[in-house]
Amino acid sequence: MNKIIAANQTLTSEAVSEGHPDKIADQISDAILDEILKEDKNAKVACEVIIAQNLVVIAGEINSPVKKNIDIKEVAKNIIKDIGYTNIDYGLDYKTITVIDAIGNQSRDIINAIEKKGSNALGAGDQGIIFGYACDETKNFLPAPYELANSILKKASNLRKSGAIKWLRPDSKSQVTIEYDKNRNPVKIKNIIVSHQHHPNISQKLIQQTIIEEIIKPTVQDKSMLDENTAYCINPSGNFVIGGPTGDTGLTGRKIIADSYGGFARHGGGAYSGKDATKVDRSAAYMARYIAKNMVAAGISKEFELQLAYAIGIENPISIQITGGINDPKYANKILNFIVNNFDLTPNGIIEKLKLKQPIYLKTCTYGHFGKNEFEWEKLDFVKKIQTALKK
């Protein structure tokens, strides 16, 4: 990676709210996963959702005896209600939706590959390329445009749900462009885009004024990054009344960049939501983030990107590589040796370290999977050990 950034170069990230159709699908997938894990911590789950108009189709594979105990249709309805889709005029109504349950059983071939007979070891649930990333741009070790894009939508969601801004509806997106100096420090916010669903009888002028003054500006912590040249694009398409799945079909796993690092890091292509922790697309991505965050917090580099690669049925990664943040090959090899010798990167090791058999996943899947400090992969408990072994 090692991005070369010239003075006055801009970088951009986007985010989506919990009411975006793809995020509705992610939340239903992860809510079902959580309900299964509450009764069976060893369940194998791959849950996919498509949502269009007033129809929700839940598919995928679940291997667990408790599957029959879960009212999957009720789980989906409760998620939609909690998001705020309580009226068909909003684009979806939990009271009238049709839910189709098309979940099957996990392939016996895959089960046999993951679970080794006569052993407690777990093989990887699939092949995959996984990246973890961190940088020093924010206190959460995330890219500044990405964190701000998410923070704006979280603020809007809070104001909508509290009733402070009654004409906001659930569906929304944001995009933030920030200017960087030659030392790769964010210095100015160049552009902020917010597209937010709204009640039909609200003027565009009021929408623009409210979103800028009551949502965006209070969210920007460093006011010096805003100036007279900052451009605000609020609902640039005009009316945004038709939203939710009436306006756009939603699908689990379609917001993988918004889920991770907002385009600042590579992505192997595997989505997170709806997958139990034997799926390394998810669990190894969390572990790679944990390692990268501790490396940056330890002062090893301003940014750090780690690639892991797995083969189905095999415990250990088949490849580990530092793909960003370290320019010295000898130092990179030293760091790699440290990673191999100090972090258990098998599925079992990751699951145990990050406590991934708990029903935590619904909380992960909105406004990014990273930067939420209640989760194990965000802890900075390896910093001192890294500094002792690796600090130049």
Curated annotation (Swiss-Prot):
Gene Ontology biological-process annotations: one-carbon metabolic process; S-adenosylmethionine biosynthetic process
Cofactor: Mg(2+); K(+)
Keywords assigned by UniProt, alphabetized: ATP-binding, Cytoplasm, Magnesium, Metal-binding, Nucleotide-binding, One-carbon metabolism, Potassium, Transferase
Region ranges (Flexible loop): 106-116
Subcellular location: Cytoplasm
EC number: 2.5.1.6
Enzyme's top EC category: transferase
Residue positions binding K(+): 48
Coiled coil: none
Binding annotation for Mg(2+): 22
Catalytic activity: L-methionine + ATP + H2O = S-adenosyl-L-methionine + phosphate + diphosphate
GO terms under cellular component: cytoplasm
InterPro entries hit by this protein: ADOMET_SYNTHASE_CS, S-AdoMet_synt_C, S-AdoMet_synt_central, S-AdoMet_synt_N, S-AdoMet_synthetase, S-AdoMet_synthetase_sfam
Entry keyword annotation includes Transferase: yes
Pathway: Amino-acid biosynthesis; S-adenosyl-L-methionine biosynthesis; S-adenosyl-L-methionine from L-methionine: step 1/1
Family the entry assigns: Belongs to the AdoMet synthase family.
Known function: Catalyzes the formation of S-adenosylmethionine (AdoMet) from methionine and ATP. The overall synthetic reaction is composed of two sequential steps, AdoMet formation and the subsequent tripolyphosphate hydrolysis which occurs prior to release of AdoMet from the enzyme.
Subunit structure, interactors included: Homotetramer; dimer of dimers.
Name this polypeptide is given: S-adenosylmethionine synthase
Native species: Borreliella burgdorferi (strain ATCC 35210 / DSM 4680 / CIP 102532 / B31)
Gene name of the encoded protein: metK
